[in-house]
Amino acid sequence: MSTSFPEGWYEPDEELHRQEMVEELQEEVGEGHVLKGLNVRLVARYRGTDDALFALDDGRIAQVHLTWSDEMETDPRFPATSVFPRFEAWLSFWNSL
């Protein structure tokens, strides 16, 4: 995804970092979570936080606050996730904050 992000968001340069973030998300997502079983790709991180943007295969974007709990979450509300139909919808939401 080649795009410009709002201030504070950045696109990680290293493939290893992107893969590690995807693996962390997959480890945390438990049964009933909106992202369980979906393929995702890291597109951006928010500096100084545990927030990340993931692209889904169908074009949707998920903003996720990772827990870094070292285990699968049992509550499907975690990691906290908001899913948007496309990047522009997320951007509009973010800019309204």
Locations of regions flagged by a protein language model:
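Negatively charged, low-complexity tracts enriched in Asp/Glu with abundant Ser/Thr
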Residues: 2-38
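Amphipathic, interaction-prone secondary-structure segments
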Residues: 28-60
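Charged interaction scaffolds used for protein-protein
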Residues: 3, 7-12, 24, 53, ...
